[in-house]
């Protein structure tokens, strides 16, 4: 076996955490031959529940699970980690304004960014799943000045996977036949899942679908509104699918994207495709050796331009809001 990889997960006793930890421990992220050390962060009142989760992890006897440590102190849990999955976030409660949500999460991700800056491994990679993910990632990144901005990413892989599922259903294809899906922008209702560069069994997806009305009025709203639809159906938010997407995103980031394909990741914009620099914006990317690169040179039609600009504008406003709160 290779040397153990130290992985931190925040919000580890939550619903997504519960789905995520057993996948990581079973080898879904790095394979069964790479041992993992789980470092699990929770708020103090949730530590008792987290102890129960650790009991279950012990009872699974996963060969790849080297050790588990839990705690409520970020500096202790993040010490020496090479991968930090920031899953825990303050959910929006009834009557809460968006500004209140940004402020509450700002305090969480400011503290975690500073702790990662102090104690994480030099080669750390940080993926943010907790919502609002793009802006939470921006806050953490802004509070970790010694960690390169390229080491931070927010999760839009769930939207990417949802888009693949919807396109596969529409075209009667297998999900494995679909490549080059793109989700632009924010993990929110303004996101833009784009099939104009996607392929279905090697053919252009938009040409296979040949239905602009479906793209505009069914596909995009279904993908963007999927989280709300799941809450309506099961009475709780997406957990297993969010955990699965978190695994997919981390695996591809660290181990590389398949040849001839790309994935969607929210990363710090360098101005590509006219997006303001510094926004945590979802792009099509290829990855290799733990590094990502934005896919450049894609043709953007007028419809796509409007959608891409609208989601950028929302992120710009979110950045301004957290700047006004003194969080970045």
From Swiss-Prot:
One of its GO terms (biological process) is tricarboxylic acid cycle. CDD domains: MDH_chloroplast-like. It catalyses: (S)-malate + NAD(+) = oxaloacetate + NADH + H(+). One of its GO terms (molecular function) is L-malate dehydrogenase (NAD+) activity. NAD(+) binds at residues 11-17, 105, 112, 129-131. The active site is at 187 (proton acceptor). Pfam families: Ldh_1_C, Ldh_1_N. Its EC number is 1.1.1.37. The keyword Secreted does not apply. It comes from the Bacteria. Disulfide bonds: none annotated. It is an enzyme of class 1 (oxidoreductase). Keywords: NAD, Oxidoreductase, Tricarboxylic acid cycle. Substrate binds at residues 92, 98, 131, 162. InterPro entries: L-lactate/malate_DH (IPR001557), Lactate/malate_DH_C (IPR022383), Lactate/malate_DH_N (IPR001236), Lactate_DH/Glyco_Ohase_4_C (IPR015955), Malate_DH_AS (IPR001252), Malate_DH_type2 (IPR010945), NAD(P)-bd_dom_sf (IPR036291). NCBIfam families: MalateDH-SF1, PRK05442.1. Belongs to the LDH/MDH superfamily. MDH type 2 family. Catalyzes the reversible oxidation of malate to oxaloacetate. This is Malate dehydrogenase. The gene is mdh.
